[in-house]
Amino acid sequence: MLRTMMKSKIHRATVTHADLHYVGSVTVDQDLLDAADLLEGEQVCIVDIDNGARLETYVIAGERGSGVIGINGAAAHLVHPGDLVILIAYGMMNEQEIAEYDPKVVFVDERNRPVELGSDPAHAPEGSGLTSPRSLTFA
């Protein structure tokens, strides 16, 4: 059996521009693509932290070191410059692949530069103001 697992995540990136009159996709700085193990043309889910919008599209490689996170085409109606987003890619894996695979989790700063790389999808970096779901307790 194959399971759909998170393989890559770029967490809390800032949208740098949105262009309604483009053929579609999301443009992402090549440095971020490398860090997250994402390829041009790969399907991603975009989650807008500011307004809750979720959409699927594909990745276009942007200029290395530019910090670009560009929302292109119809998605520009849902996601706007300045919004914080999470980009997530999933992969189909068998049980052996799941046991051996470490997802790529990339945290970025306000200029979309990688500041922390990891593999725990629930990790909240120290000083980020985020809470890991692993730290929640229930009475």
UniProtKB/Swiss-Prot annotation:
It comes from the Bacteria. It is an enzyme of class 4 (lyase). The active site is at residues 25, 58. Its EC number is 4.1.1.11. Residues 116-139 are annotated as: Disordered. Residues 129-139 have a biased composition (Polar residues). Its main location: cytoplasm. GO terms for biological process: alanine biosynthetic process; pantothenate biosynthetic process. Its cofactor is pyruvate. It is found in: Cytoplasm. It catalyses: L-aspartate + H(+) = beta-alanine + CO2. Pathway: Cofactor biosynthesis; (R)-pantothenate biosynthesis; beta-alanine from L-aspartate: step 1/1. One of its GO terms (molecular function) is aspartate 1-decarboxylase activity. Belongs to the PanD family. Catalyzes the pyruvoyl-dependent decarboxylation of aspartate to produce beta-alanine. Heterooctamer of four alpha and four beta subunits. This is Aspartate 1-decarboxylase. It comes from Nocardia farcinica (strain IFM 10152). The lineage of its organism: Bacteria, Bacillati, Actinomycetota, Actinomycetes, Mycobacteriales.
